[in-house]
Amino acid sequence: MRAGRVRPLRASDMKKDVRILLVGEPRVGKTSLIMSLVSEEFPEEVPPRAEEITIPADVTPERVPTHIVDYSEAEQSDEQLHQEISQANVICIVYAVNNKHSIDKVTSRWIPLINERTDKDSRLPLILVGNKSDLVEYSSMETILPIMNQYTEIETCVECSAKNLKNISELFYYAQKAVLHPTGPLYCPEEKEMKPACIKALTRIFKISDQDNDGTLNDAELNFFQRICFNTPLAPQALEDVKNVVRKHLSDGVADSGLTLRGFLFLHTLFIQRGRHETTWTVLRRFGYDDDLDLTPEYLFPLLKIPPDCTTELNHHAYLFLQSTFDKHDLDRDCALSPDELKDLFQVFPYIPWGPDVNNTVCTNERGWITYQGFLSQWTLTTYLDVQRCLEYLGYLGYSILTEQESQASAITVTRDKKIDLQKKQTQRNVFRCNVIGVKGCGKTGVLQSLLGRNLMRQKKIRDDHKSYYAINTVYVYGQEKYLLLHDISESEFLTEAETICDVVCLVYDVTNPKSFEYCARIFKQHFMDSRIPCLIVAAKSDLHEVKQEHSISPTDFCRKHKMPPPQAFTCNTADAPSKDIFVKLTTMAMYPHVTQADLKSSTFWLRASFGATVFAVVGFAMYRALLKQR
């Protein structure tokens, strides 16, 4: 890993400009330093104070505009000094190497004054500048080094001469570097080691870059890392040289010809100790970090415009990325993520994003572990319900870096307005939301869990505090794989506007409860009778004795009157997985809301949809097993 040609940083990667303030005792040469930099010669006549100088971005090494500000005690008040300190990004404290009084004032006046005027948690970086080195034969470093060790905010010390133009450009480069690539957040000089926040950030970067999850960065992974950070690959000999440096200092820094996490952290410690912390900062910023080593909002939440009546879905590239993420962490190749494997996956997150309810929202295996299909389903649900959170999660996984896209927004498809779908009588959507409505205890949970293939026996094992109000799984309609998202709507007198927004409604009543259907009928009349949202009535617990419903007309007559499909008998009290017929019907109705009620009542219509579902479920399963064998 070497710096090479640095990737052009985005505007959000670092500060938009740098403001350098020069302070110090009178006549130490502050103004001369600025004028020597600008004119490239020592000024014969020096004014009391130089005007503010702006160096354009195109002539600075870091391509950032730089403002240089002079301070004159004779011309400016204390209030003006305090204001300049508050506006500065870095402060150069200038002393004359031949003037002990000016050196003493560095610690007795200037550092305390600056620290009083800045926030304790975000101290300004300081540069100590020993001017007039042309007047002495000795160095002031022996005097200055103890000061540097005492104050961690001091980035570096530079001895220079405005008269001989010695180290003038270097001085301002170091000042600029102290702002854009500060040492403070990365390294603790007293302990001679990286700070915990830096180790944490670099560990996440290592985990993302270790694409086969074997605990080392092999040559291909190192080359990819080098290219995305520095826009240049490493020659085979250069790669070997890097590993040899690590081997020389660490017995466990290289394993199986790959760089271990310890070796990776050691390399960055070495960069920082050798004054090459811009290399580490380039890596950190490429992976989304700001100066405080937090992931930036611009990185986690890229701009994504979502017009009204549009939904959000993952596109093909996002699913490929998530499939590779699953494969990376499914170490035992059982097509499910164990708690330890899931924990390993979420190590690049600042928190565990999924609670125990997720295991009852998507498909799991017999041990309750999220399956391959369940994993993709949960991401589909998050994208649909809370796309900002999806962008955040993809950011933690390094989506834009590993796929070499501008941002996570490239993983999202924003569907067209639903009104256009209705006009054109076709939809391009792949995710359909079904609100499941009914009184408490009518069997809504049974409907949701049946979508995941769980019968009543399996449902009884679910703890109350682990229950989910959502369930999502794939459903095949006319040979097309779609996601059906069920949402259990709590019983209430009236539904909120948000509770009426969906693609299809499933009205559930309990055949053993005579008062159950009344609620379904009332909610239908209040909210859906005059809407264009298709509705399906489900007669739950159909394996039990049916009682007459206390309503003016029977459920069957109600459906006939309102031109709805007849009530669908449903039970989850089965030996095997419950029937998926109602889910095919619900998805079909969501896909084709314009289809006439006569068609919906036609057995031929449902037969075509169900036949397609059966054939493609079998084909899909066969393809899935083939993929697993390859994996």
Curated annotation (Swiss-Prot):
It is found in: Mitochondrion outer membrane. There is a cross-link at K166, K248, K585 (Glycyl lysine isopeptide (Lys-Gly) (interchain with G-Cter in ubiquitin)). Residues 629-631 are mitochondrial intermembrane. Mg(2+) 2 binds at G441. Residues 15-181, 429-592 form the Miro domain. Mg(2+) 1 binds at T31, P48, D70. PANTHER family: EF-HAND CALCIUM-BINDING DOMAIN-CONTAINING PROTEIN 7. This is Mitochondrial Rho GTPase 1. It comes from Mus musculus.
